[in-house]
Swiss-Prot record:
Keywords: Ribonucleoprotein, Ribosomal protein. The lineage of its organism: Archaea, Methanobacteriati, Methanobacteriota, Methanomada group, Methanococci. This is Large ribosomal subunit protein eL14. One of its GO terms (cellular component) is cytosolic large ribosomal subunit. The keyword Ribosomal protein applies. Belongs to the eukaryotic ribosomal protein eL14 family. InterPro entries: KOW, Rib_uL2_dom2, Ribosomal_eL14, Ribosomal_eL14_arc, Ribosomal_eL14_KOW, Translation_prot_SH3-like_sf. Gene3D superfamilies: 2.30.30.30. GO terms for molecular function: RNA binding; structural constituent of ribosome. It comes from the Archaea. One of its GO terms (biological process) is ribosomal large subunit biogenesis. The keyword NAD does not apply.
Amino acid sequence: MPAIEVGRVCIKTAGREAGKVCVIVDILDKNFVIVDGLVKRRRCNIKHLEPTEKKVDIPKGASTEEVKLALDAAGLLKEE
């Protein structure tokens, strides 16, 4: 199980959105990813993410609506 992959559900550990649930939407390079979900869609350092065991099925570069639907289907949307 790769820790950093598209669709991996993570918890942000730094910044104003610390403690919120997010999903990796795209991988930019070895240090940065694009996250979306219960946080604003933005670039994030992987050192500021704590990957969970959960993974949602989304395509690379999925829209915010697709991410929210996948989180809702997985029952993770209410974790705030």
